[in-house]
């Protein structure tokens, strides 16, 4: 990643467009005006228009006189940053070599080159550059962190620890230093130490977004370690509302709704914070725990403080639908759509409320409208919902099959890779599998199942189950898949079949596994019937009743 980037602007902003028009006019008058090329490249770069920025940077470098070293350094540095943003570190290194040759004492470019060498696995060269930074600034925390990262790669953990401690000692009031040390500690396998550093960073700077993001990222793979670390921080500072809120937020994100609700209530009852928006969190938890009346009261409190919050109106619609108040649910979803026209989630919820009132044609139309603006998981879900209505209620099996096929195609691994090409890389490799509900590939097994491709569907489900599953969410999706597979075979055979029985057994295996991992969404377990993914076919089996009783403590 590049060391620094300009503040992002809006390329469609009238002022930005006016500036670009001026640059275009200047270049039409003098096609070799390198300063204008460089200035326009900077504007494009600041707006993520990397191909255009690269073209202008190339032209600037081509026309800059050799004697103008200062401008050449600026242009080479910009082009190096463009290469780094587009994941071309080898090309970036060539430009950075040139900038350092022109100015060996440029702290920024030496640091950029050190990081680029590290990315390319050139640890000896990276070490040389980090040591050069220390000569330029003996208190350089960037250099110390960089040397620590190299030491970790070379398995010199004692040396790495010393560099990290030196970095913190040199700037103990800088929250970012703790975040950097946390990243390195995480790479060392020291998750507890990493969480401790993140909490120190937040104690130093409560608004540090990097610290919060890293904590959330870590929870996706090291949930227990993160919760333990936050809990230790709360024990040391029990009245810091932010720490309690963070724990609640992470617990909620990982389907531990009962624990999250307890923390939210602690903030409310102990008056740790008067933020009314917290009632949206309690409402979400109560909805997931099947406490629908209390959830409605809480979401109404949240809306009293922020009546134009569309997301809260969507949640209110979901709660009302769970209560059987279908007309009121439709009104709430319509209000959300009025506040946020063409919003995919609002359109889907409006479609589901229409479906609950047996207005199947209207539901299909709303799901179709949602597909026109949706992306990723929302798009896959909207297509699946539309296909389900067409297949089960509107006698349009051919159209339904086409939509199921479309979902299978847009969730194929290569399609997913192409869809993200050019996007900025995630902070960690685990980010790609971080948020289950945001991954459209989760619907791929069901889409393939409805396409009649059972072997491919099973393989897609196996790929999901091979991913880390800290909270049981993947296992629950597997239970949904095999429950629906069992239902499909029962429909085909007009009764029980050997394959259907096997699928039911497999579904219960994964349901038990999900609950063993603490999956605590009672709404999806007991009440949810929304297509395409639910466990409704399991609920009449005695094994379901037994599991529900055994894991009642989760709810």
Protein language model regions, located:
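Position-specific recognition of the canonical hydrophobic site in helix A of tetratricopeptide repeat
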Residues: 45, 84, 111, 118, ...
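Canonical positions in the second alpha-helix
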Residues: 25-26, 59-60, 98-99, 132-133, ...
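Alpha-helical protein-protein interaction modules
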Residues: 186, 192-195, 209, 213-215, ...
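Residue-level detector of the short coil/turn that links helix A to helix B
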Residues: 14, 48, 87, 121, ...
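Structural marker of alpha-solenoid helical repeat scaffolds
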Residues: 29, 63-67, 102, 136, ...
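Single-residue signature of alpha-solenoid repeat helices
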Residues: 19, 53, 92, 126, ...
């Amino acid at each position: 990643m590049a060391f620094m980037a300009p503040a992002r602007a809006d390329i469609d902003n009238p002022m930005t467009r006016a500036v670009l028009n001026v640059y275009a006019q200047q270049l039409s008058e003098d096609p070799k005006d390198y300063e204008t090329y460089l200035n326009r490249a900077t504007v494009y770069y600041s707006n993520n228009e990397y191909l255009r920025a690269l073209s202008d940077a190339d032209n600037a470098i081509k026309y800059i006189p050799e004697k103008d070293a200062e401008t050449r350094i600026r242009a080479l540095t910009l082009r190096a940053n463009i290469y780094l943003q587009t994941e071309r570190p080898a090309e970036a290194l060539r430009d950075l070599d040139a900038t350092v040759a022109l100015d060996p004492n440029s702290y920024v470019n030496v640091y950029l080159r050190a990081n680029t060498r590290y990315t390319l696995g050139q640890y000896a060269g990276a070490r040389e550059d980090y040591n050069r930074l220390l000569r330029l600034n003996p208190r350089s925390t960037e250099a110390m962190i960089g040397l620590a990262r190299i030491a970790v790669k070379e398995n010199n953990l004692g040396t790495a620890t010393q560099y990290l401690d030196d970095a913190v000692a040199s700037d103990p009031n800088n929250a970012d230093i703790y975040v950097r040390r946390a990243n390195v500690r995480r790479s060392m396998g020291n998750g507890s130490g990493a969480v401790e550093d993140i909490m120190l960073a937040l104690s130093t700077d409560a608004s540090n977004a990097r610290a919060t993001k890293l904590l959330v990222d870590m929870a996706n793979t090291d949930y227990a370690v993160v919760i333990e670390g936050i809990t230790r921080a709360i024990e040391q500072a029990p009245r810091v509302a932010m720490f309690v809120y963070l724990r609640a937020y992470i617990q909620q994100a990982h389907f531990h709704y009962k624990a999250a609700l307890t923390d939210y209530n602690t903030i409310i009852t102990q008056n740790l914070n008067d933020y009314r928006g917290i009632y949206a969190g309690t409402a979400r938890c109560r909805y997931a725990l099947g406490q629908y009346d209390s959830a409605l009261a809480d979401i109404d409190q949240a809306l009293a403080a922020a009546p134009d919050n569309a997301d809260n109106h969507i949640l209110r619609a979901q709660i009302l639908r769970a209560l059987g108040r279908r007309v009121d649910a439709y009104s709430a979803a319509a209000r959300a759509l009025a506040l946020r026209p063409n919003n995919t989630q609002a359109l889907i919820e409006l479609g589901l409320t229409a479906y609950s009132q047996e207005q199947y044609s209207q539901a299909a139309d709303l799901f179709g409208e949602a597909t026109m603006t949706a992306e990723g998981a929302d798009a896959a879900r909207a297509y699946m919902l539309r296909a389900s209505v067409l297949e089960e209620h509107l006698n349009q099996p051919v159209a339904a099959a086409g939509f199921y096929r479309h979902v299978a195609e847009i969730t194929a691994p290569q399609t997913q890779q192409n869809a993200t090409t050019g996007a900025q890389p995630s902070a960690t490799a685990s980010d790609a599998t971080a948020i289950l509900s945001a991954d459209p590939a989760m619907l791929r097994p069901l889409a393939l199942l409805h396409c009649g491709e059972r072997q491919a569907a099973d393989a897609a489900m196996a790929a999901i189950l091979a991913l880390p599953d800290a909270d049981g969410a993947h296992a629950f999706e597997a239970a949904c898949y095999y429950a629906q597979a069992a239902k499909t075979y029962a429909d085909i055979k007009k009764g029980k079949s050997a394959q259907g029985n096997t699928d039911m057994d497999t579904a219960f295996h994964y349901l038990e596994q999900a609950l063993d991992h603490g999956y605590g969404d009672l709404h999806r377990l007991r009440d949810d019937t929304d297509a395409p993914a639910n466990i409704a076919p399991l609920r009449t089996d005695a094994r379901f009743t037994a599991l529900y009783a055994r894991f009642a403590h989760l709810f």
